[in-house]
Amino acid sequence: MKQSLGVCYYPEHWDTSIWENDARQMKELGLSWVRIGEFAWKEIEPTEGQFNFEWLDKAIKILGQAGLKVVLGTPTATPPKWVLDKYPDMLSKDINGNIRGFGSRRHYCFSHSGYIEQCKDIVTRLAKRYGKNPYVCAWQTDNEYGCHDTTISYSDTARDAFRTWLRYKYPGKGNDGDIEALNKEWGNVFWSMKYDNFDEINLPNLTVTEPNPAHILDFRRFSSDQVA
């Protein structure tokens, strides 16, 4: 089977006057695919609810008419500052409890419901607008999912979500979970670490010495489930 080659392209970085020439040169080099859009949330939605698709429409059309297949990325790895201003508690925390702030990418906690809702909104709008576009031949969900150790967060939001996850993993009567089943599974008789209810459970960091390995394992499994 013949292999095809592609390239990442960021039309939002360049003046529109050079897009056609860029597309032509890509095709002349033998490229078949072009990925765009994965970091362009702010360009697509400058402020909440105000969308600018015109530049993206034009870029996709130019690339497609040049004979290139477009891979459209969802821009969910780079929420704009206005998202953070709306949800200041959406930032993740590292194992030392330090906030991982705005200024690069992946500045959010996967557990945060507000961030999730904003992602659903922009992804849905992109899908409706470009889902049947003949030049959009593939989609990329997010970008480098979980890199920079961002699957793990020690924020209060993550703690609350972890407690909910544990209640489902160790079910009891109703929605309260079985805390004794958790204590037994984690071996919490050691070092007097037994809990009386799930709301007592914190994240496995900032302890005097090594946290309970079973606690760490469940926290890692919870974190993995969030991005599964």
Model-derived segments and their meaning:
Residues 1-18:
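Boundary/entry segment of secreted carbohydrate-active catalytic domains
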Residues 1-3, 36-40, 106, 212-215:
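A short alpha-helix capping/helix-coil boundary motif
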Residues 2-6, 33, 67-71, 135-140:
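Structural preference for beta-strand elements that scaffold enzyme active sites
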Residues 6-8, 43-45, 112, 219-220:
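A short, structure-level motif marking secondary-structure boundaries and short turns
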Residues 10-12, 39, 75-79, 141-146:
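Active-site beta-loop-alpha junctions enriched in small/polar residues
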Residues 12, 16, 49, 53, ...:
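Flexible, glycine- and charge-enriched loops at secondary-structure boundaries
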Residues 20-101, 116, 123-131:
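Aromatic-lined substrate-binding rim segments of carbohydrate-active enzymes
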Residues 100-125, 129-228:
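Polysaccharide-binding and catalytic clefts of secreted carbohydrate-active enzymes
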